[in-house]
Amino acid sequence: RDMEPDVIFFSDAGPGVRWVGNERGVAGETNWNTITPDTLFAGKAGIEKLLNTGSENGTHWIPAEVDVSIRKGWFYHAEEDSLVKTPQQLFDLYLTSVGRGSTLLLNVPPDRRGLVHENDVAALEGFRALLDSTFKTDFALNKKVIASSYRGNSKHYAPANLTDNNASTYWTTDDEILTGNFE
């Protein structure tokens, strides 16, 4: 961290992100971004379920990273050119990773030319089209939001900021309020 203070370390126990416990591209249906890493270490047997779900009352914020390859394996093999995941399969992986609060690390290996193979490119373009069409409408945009409280009752921190499509506005509570909710 001395040389790169913003580095994110990856391992079973974090400290930045944790392995999700499989290489299928699937986070647990319930996936807490918190976990208690005290007894975890890389390669420890029998912790896959814990890594896949995290801990509701975990002591550290260590979100899961889901890793999967667009192909059967991690490296390019010409005989797998017809086995590239389809756009729909990639979209399903997105929903079972990002849709469950994880990051998605999608391996796309270069071919023997040092390029991304045409079949992989086509699958990625189809995946992008599915994402764009699925999420083109922001159903929360400018909807009314009610919150338990907001800082100083100031419009600068009001719940309406959650749906105003402005990345520089936000909702927050007063400093002494440690939990809050909105609907």
Language-model regions: role of each:
Residues 1-161, 166-178:
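Mature catalytic domains of secreted/periplasmic carbohydrate-active enzymes
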